[in-house]
Amino acid sequence: MKNKKGYLLLETVISSFIVITISISLYTLLLHSSKYKTSVEDRVELYEQGEEMCFQINKTIENSDGIISIRDLNGNTISGDTPSYVNVNSIKCKYKNSYRDVKDKEISYKRNHKLFINTLNSRGNSESGGYEIGDYVDFISVMIQGNKVAVKLSLSKNNEKYETYFKSYIKEF
């Protein structure tokens, strides 16, 4: 029998070191790719939610006969032009007139980070029900400039953030 003089132990240590290094590298690569995939999915979802909310809000405001009222987070009614964006809870739009018997609508922000479109009863209060148009909403802000309402939506999911801006034209305010 040959005497290898410790080479077997050295070969085992080197082989183990190489296997452990490759394993750690692959694990790190897998972990980072998983985080990146989640981040991209969150960004895409926020973008899609933002686009859908913009479409629904714009359609609701522009198809109305005007804005009834806009309320900020403190419950104060906003009237006239605003110099900057103001965070709001609700935007009430007038739909009912002498030619059509349709209920007025409200775009409302809920504290659970959701945005809803509700119908209003004859006293101007939200009826139960309504439908959710978006999720992950941090806040909705408006800036009124004449017959235009500039809307800013701020969304977030996990560590991803997304903001979108658009303008809606109103008939009367």
Features from the language model and the residues they span:
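Short linear sequence signals and composition-biased patches located at protein termini or domain-edge surfaces
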Residues: 140-173
